[in-house]
C-alpha cells in the first residue's frame, strides 16, 4: 500500500526504481558468486550473502534518492526518532561514538527519561602472522538510563548512564537455531563451547587483554548538549567520561569528545528519513594499542508510520575503525550494524522501542546478533 498524499507518485517512482536496481544487483552479484563459490565457498552461501548486500546497498541508494523527492519538513514526533544504538563490539563500544539521536530538541521545560535493556552476542576469532590473535566469545548486557531536558532557545542537555555486564550469556543456542532456520553461516559458533566468556587479544605474541570471568558495573558516563540549527537539523556535542572499569571492558579508561549533526525530513505522510554524521576525538585507551585520533560515524534511518501509534524502522550505522596497524578482522575494517524493529506509543507520554541487530557489511567487526528493548517517557511542562 502506497502512502497517501500529494507526494505518493514521486515516492512510487523512486520505490519502483529501487526494486529494479536491487534486481540488477542481485543478478550481477550472483553471476560473480558462481565463480567465487566454486573456488572458495559454497555458491549458495556466497549468493545468499551477496543478495543481502545488494538489498542493503539498494536501500542506501533509495534513502539518498529520497533527498530529491519533493518533501515537507517533519514535525517533532517521537515515534519517528532513531534507534539508540552503536557498534557493540566490546573492543569498540568502549569509545564514545555518538548515537543517532532525534533532530528535534526538547522545548523549554520539556523532559524525557529512558530505560533500555540490550543484549549483544559476539563470536569472532582471528589469527594474523601467527603472533596476533583475537578471541571475542561472549555477551554484553547493558541497562541504559538516560535523561534529557529542554532549556529554551533551541537548547537541550542530557546524561547517559550505562550499567554493563560481560558474561557468557544465554543466547548461543537460540542464535545457532536462528542461523540454521535461515540457512545462514554459523561462523564456528556451533562448534565452540556454549555460553562461554573468552575475550582475548595478543599482539606480537604478547597478551594485551584477557577476560574469562564475568565482569559488571557502571560504564562510561556520557554528557551531551544539543542546539537546534533549523527545523529538522540539530547539532550535538558530547563528552564520555572514564567512569567504567577498563579491566572488564566496561570503559576505555579515557575521555572522548564527539560532535554530531542529525537531520530529518518527511518523504511522505507515512515515510520519514533521517541521517547522522559524527566525529569523535579519542584519548589513549587502556589496551595500549595504536589508536586513530578521530573516528567517524554515519547513520541512516527509515521510518514507515503504519498507524498513528505504531511505526516500523530500518537503520544502518557505520563507523570507521578506531585502531591503527592491527590486521585482525574485528579491528581491520569499518564496523556496521543493521537494526530493524519498531516503536509503539503506549500512552500520550510513553512509548516502547523493540529492535534487532545484525552485523553488516563486515561480519567480523560488530556483534553477530543483538536486540534492545527501550521504554521512554516524555513529560511536557
For the regions a language model picked out, list residue spans one by one.
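N-terminal secretory signal peptides that target proteins for export/translocation
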Residues: 1-52
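Bacterial N-terminal signal peptides
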Residues: 58-66
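Transmembrane beta-barrel domains of Gram-negative outer membranes and organellar outer membranes
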Residues: 76-283, 293-381
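Residues at flexible loop/coil and secondary-structure boundary positions
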Residues: 286-290
